[in-house]
């Protein structure tokens, strides 16, 4: 796998898959020989993603379900991390799902894989302490809401 033409991508839910599908489509249009691996749904797979796990396995809600499924979720994250370390993508794009992606992104970044995160966690509304983790995990944050960019600029 040619590192300069490979991008790791992970979306954990349908809305992320829709956004990711649009991103992958545009990247393919600009660089026809780019390849993608990670986790995604129908849209991302349609646009060329090799999905390592079923995205639906990451879609957990509430307090009890994530706790029940914690061993499986940790195993999936470890598996994706090992895949990325082995294949050394040019960059890794985490789409939303911050509770899953930020830890993975931090590990990858510590191992010199560039990380991009699409859809900012709402640190401006709740859990502002996550800004420290984001700084450690993410090389570039792509925000959907205009004021989010200002928030990140104010907080370094």
Predicted regions and their residues:
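Active-site and donor-binding regions of nucleotide-sugar-utilizing enzymes
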Residues: 5-156
């Amino acid at each position: 796998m040619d590192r300069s033409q490979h991008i790791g991508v992970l979306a954990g839910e349908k809305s992320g898959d829709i956004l990711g599908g649009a991103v992958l489509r545009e990247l393919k249009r600009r660089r026809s020989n780019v390849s993608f691996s990670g986790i995604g749904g129908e849209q991302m797979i349609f646009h060329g993603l090799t999905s390592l796990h079923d995205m639906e396995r990451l879609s957990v809600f509430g307090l009890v379900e994530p706790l029940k499924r914690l061993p499986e979720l940790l195993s999936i994250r470890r598996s994706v991390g090992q895949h990325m370390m082995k294949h050394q993508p040019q960059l890794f794009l985490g789409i939303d799902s911050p509770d899953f992606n930020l830890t993975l992104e931090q590990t990858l970044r510590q191992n010199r894989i560039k990380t991009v995160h699409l859809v900012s966690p709402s640190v401006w509304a709740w859990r502002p302490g996550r800004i420290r983790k984001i700084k450690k995990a993410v090389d570039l944050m792509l925000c959907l809401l205009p004021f989010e960019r200002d928030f990140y600029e104010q907080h370094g």
